[in-house]
C-alpha cells in the first residue's frame, strides 16, 4: 500500500463513526492500508493501561493516525489517553480549522479560520498545588522554544496552504512576562515569513470580534488555555462539534481526530454524525499529499448536506451513520461537480 495509517476506532460511538469514515476514504480510491489499534477504557481491562504499547508502536512506525473519540475516565486517577499520546509523541500543535458549511445555515458571510493551539505548556502543564486549605495555585509556564515552534509551525502551514494572514492571540497587556514571551517568540518567527501578513490581538477583543465578524480572521496562533476556549467558540460559529475536525501534530507524527466526545449513550445505534471525523480524515489525506481525493470527498459531503435528504438527526435528517456515508460515496461515484 502507498500509505499505512494507524486507525484507532475509539469508544462509544467511535467504532461506527470510524467504519463509516473508512468506507468513504477507501471509496475515494486512495491506496491506504489500515492498521487497527485500541485505546481507552476497554484497554484498561485488557492490558491494564488506557494506552497499550502496541498502539504507541504502531503510531511511531506509521507516523500518521486517524482516531475516533475516547472516553476520559473522570476521577479515577488515570490520565486521559489523549493527553498521554500528546506527551509521548510531543504533539505540540493542535490544528483546528473551521469553515462555513452552507447546509448549516449560519448567519456569517464568511468563516474560514485555522486555529493553531499550543498543546504542551501554559497553565495546562498540570502544575497545580494547594498552598493551604484555602488557597490553590497553578503555574502558567510559557517557554521560548515552545512558543517559537508553534508560531513557526502555523506560519509554515499558512504558507504551504496559501493562507495570507496569521495573528497571535494573547493577554500580554496584563501577563507581561508569560504572554509577553509568547508574543515575542511569534514576532521572531514571523521574520522568516515576510510574505505573510502577521499581527496580534488581545484575547478578550478576539472573542468579541469572532462573534461579531468572524470573516476578518484567517489563521490564529494561541497559547494552550485561550486556544482550548476559542477553538470551541469557533466550532460553535460553524454550527457545533459535529463538524469540527482536528489534528495533533508533532515533528515526527500526526494524529487526526474529531474534537467531540464518544457519546456512549448512542453507542451501537448508528445515529451520530461522522462528519467531524470524516473532515479530520480529509485533513489527513491532504497531509499525506492526496489532495485530489480529499477535495472529492469534501465536495461530495457538502452536496449531500445541501440536499438534506440523507443526513443524520443533528442536521434534521433520519439517515443512519452508514447511510450518510453511503450517500457521500454515491455522490463521489456519480462524479462530483
Language-model segments: residues:
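N-terminal beta-loop-helix "entrance" segment that forms/cooperates
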Residues: 31-54, 208-210
